[in-house]
Amino acid sequence: RMIRVALVGYTNVGKSTIMNLLSKSEAFAENKLFATLDTTVRKVVIDNLPFLLADTVGFIRKLPTDLVDSFKSTLDEVREADLLLHVVDISHPDFEEQINVVENTLNDLGCADKPSMIVFNKIDNYSWTEKEEDDLTPATKENITLDELKRTWMARLNENCMFISAKEKENIDEFRETIYKKVRELHVQKYPYNDFLYEVE
């Protein structure tokens, strides 16, 4: 009886890299569309707390028909999950649109109300353009610094977002700690009589 956590997100946002990092295994992390074609589930332990982590097929706007079957197994994992980690490639120019695609897909699956957290990945790749002081044109999204983005999203989502680089292992300790807290909270609600939760820390 373990809490099930699913990594969801647009294709090519770094879900498999995060999976490898958390489970210290080598899921197929490759920079291309649909490198993960079936759902990989692993047992992960953080501070003696075990849970199941599923890496799922990336969502996209229009799914090619030959991938629909692979996608169905992903959807089952998503439906069964207790917690969704929505991974976003913050360095992608259209990341906000990708967030919408994923959220709409989750909505279509009836999973919009599940506990979830947005994980902004690839902060090491994020780039922005500083405006010249005498440039009076309105700032565009290319002019937003990472700190400004963080403030905006933190204000919008409170504690429900993290900014990491799975590849460069930036902010990974805090990421693990946040997952631990969320999984533990869900575990206490779902399986209140599990002994290992009450061991002396």
Segments and roles (model prediction):
Residues R1-R79, L83:
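Conserved G1/Walker A P-loop phosphate-binding module
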Residues R1-V13, M19-N20, K24, P93, ...:
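C-terminal-of-GTPase-core extension/linker across diverse P-loop GTPases
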Residues T56-V57, L63, I90-S91, K122-I123:
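Conserved Walker B
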Residues L67, E97-Q98:
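Residues at alpha-helix caps and immediate loop-helix transition turns in enzyme cores, especially N-
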Residues L67-H92, N104-C111, S165:
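Inter-motif core of Ras-like GTPase G domains
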